[in-house]
Structure formats: structure tokens, C-alpha cells
Amino acid sequence: MKKEHASAFRQLWRAGMAAAISTRFPGHRFVIRDLLRNGFRQNNCSFYSKEKVENTVIFLEMAASRKSVEHLILKNRLHIQMFRRKAGQRLAHYSTAKERPYFLSAYDTYEWCLQRVGTIYNLYL
């Protein structure tokens, strides 16, 4: 089980790096690295299904190979995640106590939409 887990991580890493290079934005490879590390650290081995990993690798390969809907979805995901991380670092300094809940819940609809797309197409986004 651990070997399959490591193999899935490596497959997603390779496909993700190829897709990040195709977006032509230097910070995207770091975002993919952080997303993969967090995903594999937070969930145990039984959480991952081989079918979902294969579908996600295919999705990332399609995003890397041509300018398609997959490419646009991935580019949007990486952009938002990157700017979200930057905004999170400044959140404590630039917002008041009343504004913080608003800033923290601003991406709830976006996360729900990503989860829904991942469920429909059987992917890890």
C-alpha cells in the first residue's frame, strides 16, 4: 500500500510539473508542489483510489499538451491558490476583526465548485 501511495505521488508530481511548465507562469510549480504535499500529508493511504489518480494524471497530461478546457481550469486553480496564499499572509495585518470572517469565507463557493467538478469527473483537484 505504501509503494502504491508513493507511486501515485510521483505520477501526480511528474504530470503536475509538466502542466505547470505549460502554463508559463514561474510560480505555478511551487503551487503544485504545495498542493500535492498538503494533500498527501493530510490524508491517509486508504483515502486515495487508483482510478482517481489515473484520471487526474490524464487530466494533467491533457492540460500540459494543449490549450484546452483542462489547461484553463488548471491555470485558474493555480493562479487562485497562489494569490490566496499571498493574501493569507497579509490577512492579519490588513483586515479588522469584523472583516476577517468575510476574507476567510470568500473562497467557499470556489472550493465547493472544485469539489463538485472533481466528484463529477472523478478527479483530485
UniProtKB/Swiss-Prot annotation:
One GO cellular component term: mitochondrion
One annotated GO biological process: mitochondrial gene expression
Keyword field: Mitochondrion
Domain of life: Eukaryota
Subcellular location: Mitochondrion
Homology family: Belongs to the UPF0593 family.
Name recorded for this polypeptide: UPF0593 mitochondrial protein C806.05
Organism, scientific name: Schizosaccharomyces pombe (strain 972 / ATCC 24843) (Fission yeast)
